[in-house]
């Protein structure tokens, strides 16, 4: 099997899982990662900066790295595969699950999954023209009835899919709502000959434990839960959360990598949402998030990180100082 048991994977996230993002995930304990989702039309027409999307690190050359193709035009998928064949990846995944409107309105991603016949035609084209191990990622097609999703999965497996990643929400649910564990479990039990990776709603160690228990899948893909929290991989495997200094170093190193890749102006625009994710849920004052929204220079990030002290810690310090009788020294 292409995936061993009991592994965690980083999902292909458009606009996020570039090389610096993946390197942050590796430092956080990830071992199986995908590049950003790659649009077939952009590759076919040589537009959209495909080279940077498909860059590999030295670690990835020696270990595992995969990419994912999205599209609904058979001819463009064929041409995109010709371009992808110039690169080295461990596998090529086909996207049948992206619910983002700009993808869905083109009949691709989760919308393509609804058109099973054409979805299978597109996947067959990819398997025919790419030189990589083919896999697919999809969303469940109906929340109560597993039959349509099983039909799609059966067709993909018959065409040679070596693994399936299943997001347990429908296209309409987007990234909210309850994950349907039962349908993921039924897919895993129906196709025991291939790895089935469970996906959707994993934001914590407890979420991952629930996903594994309820679906029977030992392989789990992390997506939004890993945004700003690359340590989630090691925490799920029993490791400790980051210290404040480790957190600061991770953010600084991540954004520094982006500056090297894109140049400071472009990198800092991209970095705003990344830094927001790193700040989320850690008790930092809202003023830091406001500053993250307007970052333009790496030096501004350095100042923000220097000022990043969780509100609870600030409150504790104030109480201690007040009791010592030197409250007047506080700003």
Language model regions located:
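Short secondary-structure transition/capping segments
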Residues: 44-49, 104-107, 147-148, 176-178, ...
């Amino acid at each position: 099997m292409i995936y061993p048991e009991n592994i965690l994977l980083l999902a292909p996230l458009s606009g996020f899982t570039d090389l610096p993002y993946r390197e942050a995930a590796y430092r956080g304990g990830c071992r199986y990662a995908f590049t950003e989702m790659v649009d077939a039309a952009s590759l076919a027409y040589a537009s959209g900066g495909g080279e940077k999307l498909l860059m590999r690190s030295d670690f990835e050359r020696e270990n595992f790295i995969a990419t994912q193709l999205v599209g609904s035009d058979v001819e463009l998928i064929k041409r995109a595969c010709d371009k992808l064949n110039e690169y080295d990846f461990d596998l090529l995944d086909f996207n049948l699950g992206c619910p983002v409107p700009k993808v869905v309105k083109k009949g691709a991603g989760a919308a393509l999954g609804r058109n099973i016949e054409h979805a299978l035609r597109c996947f067959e084209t990819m398997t025919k023209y790419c030189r990589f191990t083919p896999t697919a990622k999809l969303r469940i097609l109906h929340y109560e009835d597993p039959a349509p999703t099983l039909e799609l999965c059966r067709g993909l497996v018959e065409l040679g899919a070596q693994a399936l990643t299943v997001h347990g929400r429908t296209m309409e649910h987007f990234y909210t709502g309850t994950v349907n564990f039962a349908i993921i479990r039924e897919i895993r039990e129906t196709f025991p000959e291939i790895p089935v990776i469970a996906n959707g709603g994993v934001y914590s160690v407890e979420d991952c434990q629930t996903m594994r228990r309820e679906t029977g899948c030992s392989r789990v893909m992390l997506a939004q839960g890993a945004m700003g929290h690359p340590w989630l991989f090691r925490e799920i495997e029993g490791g400790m959360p980051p210290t404040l200094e480790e957190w600061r170093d991770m953010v600084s190193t991540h954004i520094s990598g982006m500056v090297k890749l894109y140049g400071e102006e472009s990198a800092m625009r991209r970095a705003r949402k990344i830094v927001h994710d790193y700040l989320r849920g850690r008790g930092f004052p809202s003023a830091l998030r406001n500053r993250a929204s307007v970052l333009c220079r790496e030096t501004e990030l350095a100042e923000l990180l220097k000022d990043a002290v969780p509100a609870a810690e600030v409150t504790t310090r104030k109480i201690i100082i007040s009791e010592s009788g030197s409250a007047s020294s506080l700003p």
